[in-house]
C-alpha cells in the first residue's frame, strides 16, 4: 500500500475494515483466528494515523445537499447514504454496510437502530449504540427498499452478494471507493470548496451537535466513543477546521 503512494490514513482505514471483517468472521466461526494479524501483540493500526484537517459541512452546505435531488441515480444513492450516515450521528461506512433488519428494535413504544461499532465491538467496554428511527431515517430506508437492490436482510445497498471473509473485504473496499467517488462528484457539482468524503458526514454531525450545545458526554455516547477523553480529543481537533 505504501509503495502505491497511499496515505497513512487510507491504509489505516483499509486495515480497520479488514480487522472488522476478520472479527466478524471469528464471531460467526468462519475464521479460526489462528493467523489474526491484529490485537495485543499484532500489527498496530493506530500507528498509521496521520493528522489531517477535519472537514465538515456548514449548515448552508448541509441544506444544499439535503435539498438537491440528482437525476443521476448513482449520485442520488450516494447522497442519500451520506444523509443516512449524518442522521445516524455520523455512522461509519463499515457499520452502515453491515446493518440488517434485526438491528431494528422496538423499545418503549419506539423503534431504534441498535448496533455495536465494528471498530470496537470486541473490546472489553464495547457498548450498544441506540439511534431513534426518526422520520428522516424511515423515509431514507423506504427509498432504498423501493429504488435499490438489497441483498438478504441488509438495510442499505452496499453488499451486493452474500460474500464472507476476504471476498467480503475486497467487495466492501471496492464499494467504499465508488461511494467516495460519487461523493466527490456531488461536491464538485454543488461547488463545495473541498472534497466531499464519507468521513465528512461524521464530522458534520459532531459540529452540529456541539454548536447546538449538546453536552460532550452525550455526543460521545451517540458517536460510540469509548470515553470522554476520546470525545474531547476528537472535538478539540476541530480547531483548525475548514468548512467544505
Task: Show where each model-derived region lies.
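N-terminal DNA-binding recognition helix of tyrosine site-specific recombinases/integrases
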Residues: 3-38, 91
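Short, charged phosphate-coordinating catalytic segments
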Residues: 23-33, 85-109
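Conserved tyrosine-mediated DNA breakage-rejoining catalytic core shared by Y-recombinases
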Residues: 40-41, 98-143
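Active-site/catalytic core of tyrosine-dependent DNA strand-transfer enzymes
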Residues: 62, 134-193
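Short, polar N-cap/turn motifs at the start of nucleic acid-interacting alpha helices
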Residues: 103-111, 192-194, 214-233
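Short, basic (Lys/Arg/His-rich) helix/loop patches that form interaction surfaces
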Residues: 171, 180-221
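Conserved small/polar residues in nucleotide/adenosyl-binding loops
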Residues: 243-244
Amino acid at each position: 500500500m505504501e509503495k502505491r503512494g497511499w496515505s497513512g490514513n487510507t491504509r489505516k482505514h483499509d486495515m480497520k475494515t479488514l480487522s472488522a471483517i476478520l472479527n466478524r468472521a471469528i464471531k460467526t466461526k468462519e475464521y479460526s483466528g489462528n493467523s489474526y494479524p491484529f490485537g495485543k501483540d499484532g500489527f498496530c493500526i493506530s500507528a498509521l494515523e496521520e493528522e489531517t484537517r477535519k472537514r465538515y459541512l456548514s449548515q448552508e452546505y448541509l441544506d444544499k445537499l439535503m435539498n438537491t435531488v440528482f437525476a443521476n441515480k448513482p449520485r442520488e444513492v450516494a447522497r442519500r447514504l451520506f444523509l443516512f450516515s449524518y442522521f445516524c450521528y455520523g455512522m461509519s461506512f463499515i457499520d452502515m454496510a453491515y446493518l440488517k433488519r434485526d438491528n431494528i428494535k422496538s423499545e418503549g413504544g419506539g423503534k431504534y437502530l441498535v448496533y455495536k461499532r465494528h471498530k470496537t465491538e470486541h473490546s472489553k467496554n464495547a457498548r450498544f449504540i441506540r439511534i431513534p428511527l426518526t422520520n428522516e431515517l424511515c423515509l431514507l430506508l423506504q427509498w432504498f427498499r423501493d429504488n435499490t437492490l438489497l441483498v438478504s436482510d441488509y438495510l442499505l445497498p452496499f453488499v451486493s452478494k452474500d460474500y464472507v471473509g476476504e471476498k467480503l473485504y475486497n467487495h466492501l473496499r471496492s464499494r467504499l471507493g465508488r461511494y467516495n467517488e460519487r461523493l466527490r462528484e456531488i461536491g464538485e457539482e454543488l461547488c463545495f470548496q473541498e472534497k466531499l468524503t464519507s468521513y465528512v458526514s461524521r464530522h458534520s454531525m459532531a459540529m452540529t451537535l456541539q454548536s447546538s450545545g449538546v453536552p460532550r458526554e452525550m455526543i460521545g455516547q451517540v458517536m460510540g466513543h469509548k470515553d470522554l477523553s476520546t470525545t474531547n480529543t476528537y472535538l478539540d481537533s476541530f480547531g483548525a477546521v475548514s468548512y467544505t
